[in-house]
Amino acid sequence: MKTQFVILIVAVVLLQLIANSEAFLSTLWNAAKSIFGKRGLRNLDNLDDDIFEPEMSEADLRYLQDLLR
């Protein structure tokens, strides 16, 4: 009886590991598809315009410089 119980517990644990790893791998696969897909690569091209565009005005910069003196 103990052997059957141990086999049952091991089987349940292994099935849980398989189910969890399948969900994890499918999430990784979907992330890779969205990053490296045609639309994903096309959307990454637009990031350069937003990064280098300053959002602070000259007055804001002067005020910060006065605060840091």
UniProtKB/Swiss-Prot annotation:
Question: What does this gene product do?
Answer: Amphipathic peptide that shows antibacterial activities against both Gram-positive (MIC=10 uM, 20 uM and 20 uM against S.aureus, B.subtilis and S.agalactiae, respectively) and Gram-negative bacteria (MIC=20 uM, 10 uM, and 10 uM against E.coli, S.typhi, and P.aeruginosa, respectively). Is mildly hemolytic at its MIC range, but shows a strong cytotoxic activity at higher concentrations, reaching 84% lysis at 50 uM.
Q: Which residues carry this modification: Phenylalanine amide?
A: F36
What are the site positions for Important for activity?
Answer: W29
Main subcellular localisation: secreted
Q: Which domain of life is it from?
A: Eukaryota
Q: Give UniProt keywords alphabetically.
A: Amidation, Antibiotic, Antimicrobial, Cleavage on pair of basic residues, Cytolysis, Hemolysis, Membrane, Secreted, Signal, Target cell membrane, Target membrane
Instruction: Name the GO cellular-component terms.
Output: extracellular region; membrane; other organism cell membrane
Q: Which residues form the propeptide?
A: 40-69
Where found in the cell? Answer: Secreted; Target cell membrane
Q: Which residues form the signal peptide?
A: 1-23
Name of the protein in its database record? Amphipathic peptide CT2
Q: Which family does it belong to?
A: Belongs to the non-disulfide-bridged peptide (NDBP) superfamily. Short antimicrobial peptide (group 4) family.
Q: In which tissues is it expressed?
A: Expressed by the venom gland.
GO biological process assignments: defense response to bacterium; killing of cells of another organism
